[in-house]
Amino acid sequence: MSVGAKAATVRTARTRPRAVAGRPKLEPVPKPLKVAVFTTSYPRHDDDFAGRFVSDAVRCLRERNVEVEVVSPGVYKEYGLVFDGGGIMHNVKQRPWIAPRLAWSMIRALRRAARDADLVHAHWLAGGVVALFCGKPFVVTLHGTISGGFLDDFRLCRKHPGLVRWILGHARAVICVSEALGEAARSTGAEHVFVIPNGIAIPETVVDEAEPLEIFYTGRLSPEKGIKQLAEATKGLNLVVCGDGPLRELVPNTLGFVSREELERRYERAAVVVCPSISEGFGVVCAEAMAHGKPVVASAVGGLLGLVVDGETGLLVPPGDTVALRAAIERLLGDRELRVRLGQGARERIIDMCSWNEVTRRTLLAYRAAVEPSMVEAQATAGLWPLHER
């Protein structure tokens, strides 16, 4: 045997643990799952509500010992992207010639972040396109609307099923935040579809409504949110609005976007929360109001249908129907017993459906479907995720 071979043999012997009679063989400790998250909507500061459900999901995954790196507008400059304020849709509409460069810079940024990742988690179908070019197993989440734009998940499934089939066909798992989105995804031929709602923070206590009774709306002031119908249906009523957007002139007394603490206070004060959307992938505002024990009046559309059980957790009205919207609001304002009953039912439903513990557990099951079986068993043995669906 050569000298080099002897040296190699010695080094190997020194690093191998000595077997001890009666002691079980030591197994290597599995490394935490590494996930690169790509999203075009993410909070840039504490009071920014853009994509907050994504940042909350990231926090919960990290609490489960998942290593997560996020690529989002807030960190684009770190990756040398050409993002320039106002949102991606705004950038592309104002300067369409930057679209190819912007797309390539996103791909490059995600490739860099995902270099050591086991999995990529892309949000929205547009994010799935970027994930396709990273050479990693990926999961894509469909959220629904993107300010009613041409990249809206519902619109893409309906208008371009072939494109959607191509994107989702390469995904190891498809997460949809509502059954309506799940049906839209399946209609294109998508497989491995998981319907997992957005997680919602559940307040410990419920605060009684304020006097005089307030009708509350919060969110983007844009056509797909039913702002025109909201303004018409609430004429002469005590409407409180938090939000901003292109239809701000229809609700000139809006408080604008407020801090999280102020938003919580507004939920607590509300007698009725209104969600008059024309299109809605999930309905974060609706779910948050329900978590606060507030009765909601919501459009019977999209993800809102999966949250509100008419007459049990709120009242549903046809989307765009101003007369029905007004009637439902007035019915609740005139019946405190009904408000209390619907509010209690709403809170119980959201606790069952949307607690972050449950949503994170189910997300990890979707990740489980996307990674190699050997890693699944090692991670499950280490207690990093459950082996079986409950």
Language-model segments: which ranges?
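Aromatic "clamp/platform" in nucleotide-sugar-dependent glycosyltransferases that forms part
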Residues: 278
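Short alpha-helical donor nucleotide-sugar binding micro-motif in glycosyltransferases
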Residues: 168, 258, 265-270
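Conserved acidic donor-binding segment of nucleotide-sugar-dependent glycosyltransferases
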Residues: 310-311, 315-322, 331-336
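Membrane-proximal helix-turn-helix segments that form the acceptor-binding/catalytic region
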Residues: 111, 157-173
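Carbohydrate-associated surface elements
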Residues: 180, 199
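Short His-centered aromatic/hydrophobic patch
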Residues: 122-127
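Short hydrophobic beta-strand element within catalytic cores of glycosyltransferases
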Residues: 295-298, 308
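Conserved donor-binding/catalytic core segment of Leloir-type glycosyltransferases
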Residues: 36, 207-225, 231-240
